[in-house]
Each structure stands twice: as C-alpha cells, then as structure tokens.
C-alpha cells in the first residue's frame, strides 16, 4: 500500500497538468521554450506516473483495468472482475 502522501502528490500532479495543458500547447506551437521553462515542473505530463486506483502501487500497472497486477490477481481469483477467468488449456 502506497503512502497517502504519494497518492495525494500524484493527484496534485494530474490537476496541475490539466490546469496548464492549454498554455503548454500554445507555448509549444509558438516555439517559446523559455516560457515553457517558466511553468511549474509538475505541469509536464511526463512527470505523471500510473498508479493502482485501489492501493496506489506504482509498479505492475495494468492500463486496461487501472489497477496493479497484484490487485488484479486477487480480484480475478475472487470473481470481482467480470469476464476474467483463470486460463486453462
């Protein structure tokens, strides 16, 4: 389980990216790299990291489900994810 501060930091980054998205786009198109440098560091989408929606785990993230592999396995074994079952051939 990730620390609450790490989860909060990631949410704050998402909000900052959304806030400055239009301004970043305009500055990039104009080629104003000095203006881009003056924006906050967290305004860049490169600094965002995918995290599990339930546990906040940063590694082993499955984009299709929005959760980590560990959480996915637990939920799939308990039948909590519709349409997912253990492979057998």
From Swiss-Prot:
PROSITE patterns listed in its UniProt record: RIBOSOMAL_S14
Keyword Ribosomal protein attributed: yes
InterPro entries: Ribosomal_uS14, Ribosomal_uS14_bac/plastid, Ribosomal_uS14_CS, Ribosomal_uS14_sf
UniProt KW Cytoplasm keyword: no
Gene Ontology molecular function, alphabetical: rRNA binding; structural constituent of ribosome
Gene3D superfamilies per UniProt: 30s Ribosomal Protein S14, Chain N
GO CC, alphabetical: cytoplasm; small ribosomal subunit
One Pfam family of this chain: Ribosomal_S14
UniProt KW keywords: Ribonucleoprotein, Ribosomal protein, RNA-binding, rRNA-binding
GO process terms (BP): translation
Highest rank taxon of the organism: Bacteria
Family designation: Belongs to the universal ribosomal protein uS14 family.
HAMAP family on file: Ribosomal_uS14_1 (MF_00537)
PANTHER family: 30S RIBOSOMAL PROTEIN S14 (PTHR19836), SMALL RIBOSOMAL SUBUNIT PROTEIN US14M (PTHR19836:SF19)
Quaternary structure and partners: Part of the 30S ribosomal subunit. Contacts proteins S3 and S10.
Function in brief: Binds 16S rRNA, required for the assembly of 30S particles and may also be responsible for determining the conformation of the 16S rRNA at the A site.
Name listed for the protein in its UniProt record: Small ribosomal subunit protein uS14
Gene source species: Flavobacterium psychrophilum (strain ATCC 49511 / DSM 21280 / CIP 103535 / JIP02/86)
Gene name, Swiss-Prot/TrEMBL: rpsN
């Amino acid at each position: 389980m990730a620390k609450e501060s790490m989860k909060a930091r990631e949410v704050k980054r998402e909000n900052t990216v959304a806030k400055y998205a239009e301004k970043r786009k305009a500055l990039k198109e104009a080629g104003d790299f000095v203006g881009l440098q003056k924006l906050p560091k967290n305004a860049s989408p490169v600094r965002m990291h995918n995290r599990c929606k339930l546990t906040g785990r940063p590694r082993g993230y499955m984009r299709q489900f929005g959760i980590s592999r560990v959480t996915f396995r637990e939920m799939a074994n308990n039948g909590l994810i519709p349409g997912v079952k253990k492979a057998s051939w």
